[in-house]
Design a protein with these regions (language model features):
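Short, acidic/turn-prone active-site loops that include or flank metal/cofactor-
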Residues: 132-136, 190-194, 208-210
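Alpha-helical substrate-recognition element adjacent to the catalytic core
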Residues: 2, 13-133, 137-138
Length: 218
């Protein structure tokens, strides 16, 4: 009896392993929405805030620099949130995401922060977002807390351990670990330096082209 149950359980697990159940992970900024820090740089006329993960692969170095600039110029969380409230998703992003979510489960893996994301998520019909959190005191951003280190890659690795076929897309240096960990990875809207350093990832510029690639990889 026990042996039969064991064989049955093994058979069920084997059947599960044969089923290719896909999940898609996407970066947010630069893929679905404008780059928040570039928008803040334009509003505050501080060009040094234009530096993003497209330019700097060391995320902690990038964020420490941003926090120092904000402190130096007295820029508060509410100032940044006002800028974010004026932003709209990239052209075609909502339609792309709506169609994709009708086909497959989608998770947004972003190095943005909970306190930044809500206005943009609302316009995208509230997709699932995993991101980090700011430490705020009296409206001043004093620090940031990572969800976990290397959260994009770790999330993809966890999905793969759950027997998901993971398809990932991003645009920046901080997405490349996620793309490497995924079963299939694509670049969209990536700058030339990222495309040149990571030629193994097919690169596209249009959401329609990315949707075709994802459908083909499922």
């Amino acid at each position: 009896m026990i042996a039969a149950q064991t064989r049955h359980a093994a058979g069920v697990l084997e059947d599960c392993a044969r089923v290719k159940q896909s999940i898609v992970t996407l970066d947010m900024e630069g893929v679905l929405t404008p780059e928040i820090w570039i928008a803040v740089a334009e509003k505050t006329k501080l060009p040094e805030l234009r530096r993003t993960t497209r330019d700097e692969p060391d995320y902690d170095k990038l964020m420490r620099g941003r926090l120092a600039i904000l402190d130096q110029h007295g820029i508060k969380l509410s100032d940044i949130q006002a800028v974010i409230g004026s932003l709209r998703p990239l052209a075609g992003a909502k339609e792309f995401l709506d169609e994709l979510r009708a086909l497959v489960q989608v998770v947004i893996l972003s190095d943005t922060f909970e306190q930044f994301a809500a206005p943009l998520l609302r316009q995208l019909n509230f997709p699932t977002l995993l991101c980090h959190r700011l430490v705020v005191a009296d409206d001043r951003i004093v620090d940031y807390q990572l969800r976990i280190r290397d959260q994009k890659r770790e999330a993809v690795a966890a999905f793969r351990r759950m027997n998901y076929h993971v398809i990932s897309a991003g645009d920046s240096y901080n997405d490349t670990a996620m793309l490497k960990e995924a079963n299939v990875g694509f670049l969209i809207h990536a700058p030339d330096n990222v495309k040149q350093e990571f030629p193994q990832f097919q690169a596209v510029e249009a959401h329609a082209d990315l949707l075709k690639l994802i459908k083909g990889a499922m």
